[in-house]
């Protein structure tokens, strides 16, 4: 619904009755806050993990068997594993959410000036209604979307909404206004803007959440609350996108594989043993149906045991511990991770779509270069030396401006603020310089004249200072010959670098439009952050493509892209034209492409300028459709929809509340370099999860084979339920802590991103799991045979079973070293003493095993062992497991060196 601004009396504003009617008709000026997830729902969500779901099924089956056998220890262990895994994830996400809420508080009670009942008054922002006449001036935040009917030198900082740091606003004629009103500026990417090709929003509209940087104006409110441009963007940013993270996809796939493999093995084992029993056991030829049922039940329980043992109980705990520890560590490096899986997903990222203003640049205009004129020759009675000439220029900068500085921060026009900051850098106090001058007359800047002039009295002399567009100001000066050529070449150089250019001139006496004395030209820009080019280069080395999506002009966007390294620094005119056609597009042009055309362009794009929120969101969706894992960075409200739709959204700590709410990670230090660090953390985390999977599945496979082996030879399981509980849950928890606490490796940044479709268990991991699991089973089986033949009698006693249990645990203990160095040619002992978490866990496992063996007694079916037995088992298992692992890595190191030669 479009409001007719003519329905408001501009001179009087709305009366009390009209306010009530408008509030009922159009609503309040309040943005609907994002719906908070209740603590209960957040906790329940943790049970939707695919591995957890399998564990719950296993726990239920185990519970049924527990009632039959009257043994609840294993069942309790599985339920404990489920509880711990879900609670860890819930606790850390809730903790991060608490920290995050502090960053996203929204103030709807901010006072704004309105004209009501013929008087100017201040009311809270929430009380504004459609049709209100609002008054805005320097420093104000625009409270609602409004249409200007009066504007004096009005300039708006739209960087939070469009990426454009300074937009000049003016009153349009009726035809232009009508065209602007017919346009939807936010959500429909099939519309084309009514304004110019290089404009994001019409010049007569001021939008909620933008800041007034210069001038003042009056406007009629046309949209409030969720109907404002920022309201539409907020709704988009809060939509549930249902985008699954790469790790979720991999864990789903692993869960299906484990459940299928476990069911198949259990079914085959059940059928095989039952058929063998039918063929060899005479009971099947009798009428003892109760005995037959007992045999079937025994084999069925064995099959269920196989299914339960196939499930890696420690995996959810390991994943959540790894993610949670990463959250804590990344917070220390100024990355506030809100969602557990976001830290790992950064490691799978293939494309980063980044905003420009505030993300790549400092969002602070500064003087990049200044070309000052030499001391002029004597003219009439004007005679300057170097000191007096510089002082006159400093005075020109101090008085011929509308800006101020507040503790070094510009207030007002950011371009003029940059000049004052440059003045301070030269050791000049602009306030003191102003005190030395008396302003006689001031001619403000306007879009028609394109210059500003100030006449002052200094030391009983009158001077006029002029500042403005170089093409206007230089025509007023006496500049000629080589001096003129040098200035024009300098200006051309500034413009090539997408700088804003200004020229300065002066004269004695009142203003005259010719024969001014040229003082200087300057190039002003929003500088690139110092660490950005190196961070972009790091991303490129890691195989990640960086795309810039900004609301700024094409020339500025391409130049910044060139400075940070996503656009060639040197190319001729022909190449530049070719690159612009392939790698660059404006938001309006992108919105006019069909879905097929946009899909093809999305992969090639490096820079999108004049982008609107829907354009960014569409680009992200198309990249995801093409199989890319997309991270989006941004600080403005305009970035929020894309942040929400991306696999990982990264907002800046200084960004808007809407952007932060839509993101998964907040960069507290506003540094793009933190993104490269997040990628390194994510990739290292994924490797740590793979290491734990290797370790856990070796344990499960060897235990599974022992159950099968015991059934084949007709003996009871040599490991008790409590012993398996120690191996599968407690020890695995220690292993999860150890492997999750391994520090990130910078070597991962030299690798290409993994394919989203690549299974979390690689072929080499499968080979290692099968080899180690089978080897451990064979070793333990041989150990059982040795115990039978060399023990006291044919029955294996408790002492021998204790030796068996300790040997099995020590095999897994040493295998932890192999897991640590998995996928690397480096020794498992490389940086060993730096991995404090691993060292501590190894000590805890040894201590725990000693306590269980020494004091476990009947509960763990153990007897104390002598020191000789301890040393023999530790040395023997270490030699076999660690020795073979180190030998294999040594062979691989030699192979790599041979290939390099």
Residue ranges and their predicted role:
Residues 767-783, 810:
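Alpha-helical transmembrane segments of multi-pass integral membrane proteins
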Residues 1-753, 760-761, 774, 789, ...:
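Conserved cytosolic headpiece of P-type ATPases
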Residues 755-769:
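Hydrophobic alpha-helical transmembrane segments and their immediately adjacent juxtamembrane loops
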Residues 782-792:
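Juxtamembrane and boundary regions of transmembrane helices in multi-pass small-molecule transporters
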Residues 793-801:
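Membrane-interfacial loop- and helix-cap regions that link adjacent transmembrane helices
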Residues 731, 776-777, 801-817:
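Generic alpha-helical transmembrane segments
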